Amino acid sequence: MKYTISPQLVIYVGKGQEIKRALYLTPYGILDDKSSIYYFLKTHLNIHNPEIHKRHILLTLKIRQVKGYLSNLLNINDDIIIYSHKNNLEFSYVDNTIFNPFTNTQRKTLIRSDGFLYNIYPGACDFLVIWVTNSKDTPMLEFGSYEEVDSNILKFENHLLDVFNSLDLEMNIESKFNNIFRTNLKSTGLMTIIKKINESDTSYKSLLYKSDEYFINMTGNHFILTDEKLNLSVWDSDSCLAFSSDGDTIVINNVKLFTELVSDINAQMERIKGDVTYKVFLSTPITSRIKLDIETSFVFVETATNNILLSADKKISIILAKNHISIKVKNYIPNIEKYFTFLVVAINSMFNSVQRSSDFTKVETVYWSRICQNTNNKNRKPVIVSSLDVDMKKISNCFYKSKSLEVFINSNGVMFSCIDPMGKYNSIGFLSIFYKLQKMCIPCCFLKDQSHTDTFSSCVYNKDVSNDIISPYILNFGKVVTKSKISFLPIIFDSFLNEGLRISFEQDNKRLKETTGYHVVKSCNGDIIRLRTTSDIIAFVNDKNTILIADDIIYFPMNYFSIGNNIYILVQEIVHEVVLVKKKINKDVISTFSPNSIILRELFPKQTKSVTIRSDSGMELTTDGFLIDGVKFNKDLSSKFMTFTKNVTTSDYISKYFSPLFKYVITESKERFIKTWVINIMLNFESDVNIESSVIISRLEEYYPNHGKKITN
């Protein structure tokens, strides 16, 4: 999705509120006749040809700074008052009535503010209209003031507009709301909401769940078991949880949907906690360590950490990475995450653009000293020579070779050669990582001939290198892995999955040299998948019929026979693949293969054949699922009325007997799992809760000797 910066409107009015000037501000420099601002101009003000200025009011400015900017924009040297027909700006009334300097009022009720524009005017990212008038032309002469414009603001704006047309504002956004309120929506209020959803023709999923000692009551169209006595959960059309309430508090993820559903309910809300975290994925990488060259405290505040910025009011934090930006805000402001991303991308272009000179000597020479360095008896740093030897043979337009020497000539005519006094590192090669990232051919000296490598072919023969080539440098586990990277597994799984496998590295680093097969972590193809909760993990594992590793836990799907060959692993909530990599010593290419999933599958506590738990009237509950007339039932259930199900009382003796085994169970609801287990035992024994303890214990010891205290075959 490409973010479009909305135009802004400045209206300068005279003594009788007649419009003297209408200024249409846009960084694009042209009028957008489809914008809401132009519609307002044309329809409500009857202005079809406003003044078009390639300008932009920064929404991060304080009101005092905005006044200085507007005085400069309009070339006014007198005291002015600014206001808006949509929001209060500098002045407001205690009852939040919209302030207008031409309307008589009791002046003692006025409150003056110097807040930040995006806070005072919440819709400013999409629709900003500011009215300006000379205070002497109003009945409120004493409320006017004159502010000098901050020259740094104008300097920043000029820089911004200079680079604007080159900015890549393509972005994808994930949002995570953390809004928790105390509410008066008790059982009756929740019933009203579920009734409204059931009566409406929507794609929303919902469930109202009530339970006590004797009954479980459910209504809705998304039947799942919860562990709360009262719970209303509503999922949006994308199957994401919109909001959930236990009757005392409510967690809201989809503010718009919740507002629609309670519009005719007298809902009282008291905020307990609230913030929104946006993760913005960028189309073009940025420099994560931003350093500002001019005073920009009116936009962002720098911190001691190079990749973290704060908003000017220090209430919004911005964490920068190469390919994404995380923005955390306290209160929901429409499209503020897109606007702040625009500012970050602009600042990155203005002050932190990557130098792309192809002449290695003109780039940072620190590359040579750190990456292609001379250490002890290793002379890997190439030297610059002034001419070619007579006996040299031309290999390509930029590469010459003799029996004792090789010379590479870059695009600027600089000649590099490897002359090792020890006679070892005399073969010219190139650092593949820099070629992949920036198409830079940086020479380095190697022990063996490098002509077989893809990077050599690209730099010497101008052949394209596939973007899918994997870097031979293996990262430590814990970092999110990009498409061209791989990382080690966690230590415990690295030892387990790679037992007996061999891998060799270049001396003194983690650059893969050779392996006939080794398990590592790789990014998944396609869209990024995030699993934030245990519920998400369980749903993913069962939907994909796959194995997933999260922390030190291995998750298996319910049905052993449906398990596929893939193994996934969670890194910072993002799903990655476990793959087997192979590399030959004389090749750069790293090949990936399916992992040896049998190693993990053998750990599965498998039920080798389907067992019927209960059967009646053509309905059959088995270890493989629920069947009706022999066909697996997988349709969504829906209920527009209240249904009652008896709650079951279980035997404490059975749960205590298996308690040593239960401590190894990992599930979303352990109590529910234990209760289900105990019910199945009771059904097998055809017993009730009143059976004597001596009888039940003896039968358990006879049929279930392996209950966790010791392992028996």
From Swiss-Prot:
Q: Would you kindly state one Gene Ontology biological process term found in this protein's UniProt entry?
A: positive regulation of DNA-templated transcription
Provide the species name: Yaba monkey tumor virus (strain VR587)
Q: What is the lineage of its organism?
A: Viruses, Varidnaviria, Bamfordvirae, Nucleocytoviricota, Pokkesviricetes
The transmembrane residues are none
Q: Does the keyword Translocase apply?
A: no
Q: What is this protein called?
A: Early transcription factor 82 kDa subunit
What's one GO MF term for it?
DNA binding
List, alphabetically, the InterPro entries matched: Poxvirus_early-TF_lsu
Question: Which UniProt keywords are listed?
Answer: Activator, DNA-binding, Transcription, Transcription regulation
Please state which protein family the record places this protein in.
Belongs to the poxviridae VETF large subunit family.
Q: Does the keyword Transport apply?
A: no
The highest taxon in the source lineage is Viruses
Q: What does this protein do?
A: Acts with RNA polymerase to initiate transcription from early gene promoters. Is recruited by the RPO-associated protein of 94 kDa (RAP94) to form the early transcription complex, which also contains the core RNA polymerase. ETF heterodimer binds to early gene promoters.
Subunit relationships: Heterodimer of a 70 kDa and a 82 kDa subunit. Part of the early transcription complex composed of ETF, RAP94, and the DNA-directed RNA polymerase.
